[in-house]
Structures are given as structure tokens and as C-alpha cells.
A protein has these predicted regions:
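Mobile cap/lid helix-loop segments that gate and shape the active-site cleft of serine hydrolases
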Residues: 135, 140-175
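Alpha/beta-hydrolase active-site loop
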Residues: 81-100
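Alpha/beta-hydrolase fold nucleophile elbow
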Residues: 101-112
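Short beta-strand/loop motif that positions the catalytic acidic residue
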Residues: 179, 185-187, 191
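C-terminal catalytic histidine-bearing segment of alpha/beta-hydrolase fold enzymes
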Residues: 200, 209-248
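Short beta-strand element of the alpha/beta-hydrolase
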Residues: 34-43
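N-terminal cap/lid segment of alpha/beta-hydrolase-fold proteins
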Residues: 1-30
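Short amphipathic alpha-helix adjacent to the substrate-entry channel of hydrolases
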Residues: 49-67
Length: 248
């Protein structure tokens, strides 16, 4: 059942992606939709699942916010393929939103695991900007730094040396160019889950490619900023979106 507030309707929706029933959590404003924020979650399963509180951070009276669960997660059909078929869950959702709200600005926010999810999809979609927040930018860096996740990565993708093609297929940087939408890189200097070297690496690569980008580093913060820093982060992200829309 949808939940109504004074400004939005909150509901879980289901859409088709590769003939699979995939779920997403959506906050729709009662007023005209002028901006859409697509939040790409981190984690897997219950860890990092999309919650209303997270979506509310990006909402206002004319902003629709939505977070796909990805296939194989939280009631969605299929199997989580970790940056393969689940990418279609992002692209299909974006196209549905663009068809329904063709005049609305669309911004993607990729958090943690969702960082690479966005990098692998955003340049081919009708989006105005991409914000990567505490996000994975390189699958090999992820394997190298997260010893605790290597078992899961080997099960889902393979070994980075023995199954090299599977890892190369999950590399986003080669597909990004100077015509890609503007990118904002947000990261905490004390992030222990996705090290800030992911942000540094991405920024260096974007500089080489001549892609429009900004960085917002909070060197005293971890994976999730503390409340005062969270306010600063959200303020910066929203102003970035405003500036992108102003110059679009």
C-alpha cells in the first residue's frame, strides 16, 4: 500500500527488466515532477537496502526519488549478477522514467557498490549528471582492498586472473569520454569500506579524458558522513544538481 505524506507518495513499484519482475522504492511528489533522482544502492541483499529515509535526503516538492533494489534482492526476481544483468535494471528504469517525465532533469546517485553501477550505465542514458558517493570506481581495486569480500567476488564473478574477461567487462573507465554527463565525486578520507583511492583514481582518469567533473572530499569522514558533515554533503550535491540544470 502506498504511504501518503503532505508532499509525496511513497510506494514500492515493480517493473520488467529482461522479463524479470524487479522492485524499486519510489517517492513521487504531489506537484509537477521537475527533477528525478535515481539512487543506486550499495551492498547486497539486506545490507545497504533502499530505505525511505535515504530517499528523503534528496526529495523536495518537485523531485521524484527512486531506488531500484536490483534483481535477486529484496523480493525482485532473478539472481544478483554483480554488475552484469543488474545493469539492465538501472537502464530500463531510467528509460521508463524518461518516457513518463520527458521534461524532467534526471540525476543518478551511486553509493558504495552503486558507484560502479552508475559508471557502467550513466553515459548511455538520458541523465543530466552523475554523483558517485563513497563509490567503487574499479572492480580490481575493490578486490584488492576488500579481503573480506574476495570469496563473494570469486563466487559471483570469478578470480581476477583466471577469469580476466569477467573483470574487464566490469571496467567502466574505457567507456567514459569528454561527452559524458558531468560527474561529482564525493568521498570520505577515512572511508574503510571503499577507500578514497577509488575517488582519486576516478578523478585522475576523468582529468585525462577531459570529462567535466568536480570533487568533494571530507577527509575526516568515513563511509557515511556524521550528521553535520552529512548536511554539508547533501547541500553540495543539491547545489551541483542546480548548477547542472542551470547550464543545461
Amino acid at each position: 500500500m502506498p504511504i501518503e505524506s503532505f508532499t509525496h507518495q511513497l510506494e514500492e513499484i515493480t517493473y520488467l527488466s529482461d522479463d524479470l519482475q524487479v522492485k524499486a522504492l519510489m517517492m513521487t511528489p504531489h506537484h509537477e515532477v521537475k527533477r528525478i533522482v535515481v539512487y543506486l544502492r550499495g551492498g547486497k541483499g539486506q545490507v545497504g537496502r533502499v530505505r525511505a529515509g535515504r530517499l528523503m535526503q534528496f526529495s523536495d516538492s518537485q523531485t521524484l526519488v527512486i531506488g531500484p533494489y536490483y534483481r535477486g534482492n529484496n523480493g525482485s526476481e532473478g539472481k544478483d549478477e554483480f554488475y552484469r544483468g543488474d545493469l539492465n535494471d538501472v537502464t530500463e528504469l531510467l528509460r521508463l522514467l524518461h518516457d513518463k517525465y520527458p521534461q524532467a532533469f534526471i540525476h543518478m546517485v551511486g553509493f558504495s557498490r552503486g558507484g560502479l553501477q552508475g559508471l557502467l550505465t550513466f553515459q548511455d542514458l538520458p541523465v543530466n549528471s552523475y554523483i558517485i558517493w563513497g563509490g567503487v570506481s574499479d572492480i580490481d581495486l575493490m578486490y584488492e582492498e576488500r579481503v573480506d569480500l574476495r570469496g563473494m567476488l570469486r563466487r559471483m564473478i570469478g578470480h581476477p586472473k583466471k577469469d580476466r574477461a569477467a573483470y574487464e567487462a566490469r571496467q567502466a573507465i574505457p567507456n567514459i569520454n569528454e561527452n559524458s554527463p558531468p560527474i561529482l565525486i564525493v568521498h570520505g578520507g577515512k572511508d574503510q569500506q571503499v577507500g578514497i583511492h577509488h575517488a582519486y583514481y576516478l578523478a585522475d582518469q576523468l582529468e585525462l579524458k577531459g570529462d567535466t567533473h568536480e570533487t568533494f572530499y571530507q577527509m575526516a569522514e568515513g563511509h557515511v558522513p556524521r550528521p553535520p558533515a552529512m548536511v554539508e554533503t547533501l547541500t553540495y550535491i543539491k547545489e551541483f544538481m542546480n548548477q547542472v540544470e542551470l547550464h543545461s
